[in-house]
C-alpha cells in the first residue's frame, strides 16, 4: 500500500511555520520552504501572493506549487495517530476494556461497541470513527471554502478601493491642470474666479479622499472579521482527529454562516460636482456651427472589449443588443475651431464625440483608441459612469441636458461641456490628434 512506502515524518516537517499547526493544503516556494496555502496568502494581511518567502525572505518570482506528497503524508500520519490513540490502554473503555471505535453524535464522545448498545445511548445516532472524522472534516472544509471565497471577493473590493483612491488623486490633479488651461483662454483673465474654482476643487477632493479612506477601512474591518472566523475554523481543522470529534462546533459553524451572509460593503463611487466657469459657454458660442446628423452607420459593440467596435453594413439587423445605429455629421473638419451641442436629455445611455474621417469610410474596420475621441455615458447597476476612448472612468457629475462639444483642430483636442451648468466635463489633452475628424453621436433610452 502507498502508506507503507511513506515514512512517518518528524513533527517539525508537518508543521507550518506561520500558523504553527499541522499543514492544511501544503504548498512550497521556489526556495523550498513549505506553508499552508491560506497561511501564505494571508501572510501580508492581503489575500494575495506574497512578495517574499516568510522564512528566508527570498523574493517570490513565481507562484507556489502544491505539495501533493506532503498532503498525503499529513493525512496518513493524522490517521495513524488516531489509531495509536484508540489502541492505547489508557483510552480503552474503562468498563469493558474494549477499543472505543464508535462515535456518539448526541453526546460527542467515543464509545466501545458494548457501550453504544447500552440503554443510555440506545436512542442516539452512532457511526464509526472513520465516518465521523470524514463528515466532521467535510463540514469544516465546506465552511472554510465558503468563507475563503467571500474573503477573496472582499479583497477584490479592498484593492478596487485602493485603485480608486489613486485614480481619484490623479484625476483631480489632471482636472486642475485642465481648469487652469480653460481659464487661461478666457478674456478678460479671471484669476480670482480661477483660484476660487481650484480651491473648491481641492476642498472637495480632500473631503472625498477622506470618505474613500473610511470606506476602505470599513471593508478591511469586515474582511478582518471574516479572517478571524476563518482562522478559528482552520485551527480546529488542524486539531488531532480524536479531539476534533468531541468538540461542539455548533457555535463556530453558526458564526461562520452569519459571517458568510453579512452584506459586503461595496465601496463608494466618488463624484466631482459641476462647477460653473464664468463666460465659458459665451466664449464657445463664438465658434458655434450647425451640425447636420443625417447619415447613419452601424456599430457592432463588444461588451467584453468595449472599444472593439466594428463598422457594419447598412443592411445588418438591429435585433442584437450589441448592434447600434450611430448618427454622424455630413462634414468633416481638419482646420479651425468648432462648437456644437447635442441634446441628450432623458437618455440613459449616450456617446458623443469625433472620429477619424477615413475610418468612417471603411467597412468592417475595428476601432482603435487612435481612431475615436468620445465621451460615453453608461448605466452601471445603480449609477452612471462617464468614460473616454481608453475606457477610463471619470468621476464627474453626469450632465442632465445638452452636452457641448468643442473641437480645436489646430490644438488637436476635443472638450465636452455641461451646457446647463456652464461647466467643463472633461477635455482631451492638446495634440491628441492631427487629422480630419467627423462628429458623431449615439443615444438610447435603455
From Swiss-Prot:
Zn(2+) binds at residues 93, 96, 115, 121. Keywords: Metal-binding, Zinc, Zinc-finger. Coiled coil: none annotated. Pfam families: SPRY, zf-C3HC4. One of its GO terms (molecular function) is zinc ion binding. A zinc finger (B box-type) spans 88-129. Signal peptide: none annotated. A zinc finger (RING-type) spans 16-57. Residues 271-446 form the B30.2/SPRY domain. Belongs to the TRIM/RBCC family. This is Tripartite motif-containing protein 43C. It comes from Mus musculus.
Amino acid at each position: 500500500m502507498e502508506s507503507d512506502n511513506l515514512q512517518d515524518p518528524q513533527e517539525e516537517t508537518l508543521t507550518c511555520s506561520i500558523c504553527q499547526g499541522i499543514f492544511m493544503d501544503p504548498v512550497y516556494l521556489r526556495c523550498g520552504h513549505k506553508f499552508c496555502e491560506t497561511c501564505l496568502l494571508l501572510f501580508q494581511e492581503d489575500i494575495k501572493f506574497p512578495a517574499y518567502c516568510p522564512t528566508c525572505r527570498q523574493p517570490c518570482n513565481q507562484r507556489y506549487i502544491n505539495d501533493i506528497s506532503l498532503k498525503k503524508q499529513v493525512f496518513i500520519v493524522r490517521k495513524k495517530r488516531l489509531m495509536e490513540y484508540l489502541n492505547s490502554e489508557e483510552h480503552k473503555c474503562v468498563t469493558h476494556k474494549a477499543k472505543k471505535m464508535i462515535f456518539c453524535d448526541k453526546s460527542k464522545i467515543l464509545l466501545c461497541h458494548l457501550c453504544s448498545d447500552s440503554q443510555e445511548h440506545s436512542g442516539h445516532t452512532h457511526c464509526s470513527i472513520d465516518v465521523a472524522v470524514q463528515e466532521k472534516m467535510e463540514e469544516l472544509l465546506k465552511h472554510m471554502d465558503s468563507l475563503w471565497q467571500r474573503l477573496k471577493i472582499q479583497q477584490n473590493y479592498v484593492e478596487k478601493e485602493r485603485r480608486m483612491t489613486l485614480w481619484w488623486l490623479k484625476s483631480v490633479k489632471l482636472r486642475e491642470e485642465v481648469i487652469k488651461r480653460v481659464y487661461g483662454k478666457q478674456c478678460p483673465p479671471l484669476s480670482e474666479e480661477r483660484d476660487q474654482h481650484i480651491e473648491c476643487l481641492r476642498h472637495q477632493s480632500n473631503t472625498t479622499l477622506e470618505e474613500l479612506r473610511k470606506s476602505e477601512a470599513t471593508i478591511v474591518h469586515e474582511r478582518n472579521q471574516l479572517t478571524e472566523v476563518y482562522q478559528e475554523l482552520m485551527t480546529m481543522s488542524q486539531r488531532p482527529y480524536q479531539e476534533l470529534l468531541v468538540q461542539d462546533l455548533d457555535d463556530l459553524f453558526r458564526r461562520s454562516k452569519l459571517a458568510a451572509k453579512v452584506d459586503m460593503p461595496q465601496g463608494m463611487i466618488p463624484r466631482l460636482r459641476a462647477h460653473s466657469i464664468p463666460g465659458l459657454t459665451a466664449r464657445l458660442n463664438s465658434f458655434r456651427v450647425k451640425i447636420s446628423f443625417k447619415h447613419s452607420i452601424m456599430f457592432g459593440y463588444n461588451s467584453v472589449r468595449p472599444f472593439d467596435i466594428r463598422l457594419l453594413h447598412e443592411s445588418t439587423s438591429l435585433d442584437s443588443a450589441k448592434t447600434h445605429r450611430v448618427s454622424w455629421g455630413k462634414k468633416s473638419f481638419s482646420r479651425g475651431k468648432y462648437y456644437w451641442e447635442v441634446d441628450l436629455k432623458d437618455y440613459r445611455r449616450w456617446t458623443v464625440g469625433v472620429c477619424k474621417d477615413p475610418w468612417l469610410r471603411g467597412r468592417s474596420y475595428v476601432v482603435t483608441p487612435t481612431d475615436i475621441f468620445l465621451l460615453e455615458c453608461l448605466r452601471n447597476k445603480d449609477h452612471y459612469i462617464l468614460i473616454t476612448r481608453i475606457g477610463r472612468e471619470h468621476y464627474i457629475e453626469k450632465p442632465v441636458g445638452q452636452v457641448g462639444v468643442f473641437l480645436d483642430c489646430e490644438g488637436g483636442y476635443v472638450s465636452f461641456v455641461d451646457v446647463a451648468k456652464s461647466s467643463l466635463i472633461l477635455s482631451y489633452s492638446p495634440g491628441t490628434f492631427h487629422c480630419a475628424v467627423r462628429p458623431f453621436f449615439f443615444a438610447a433610452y435603455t
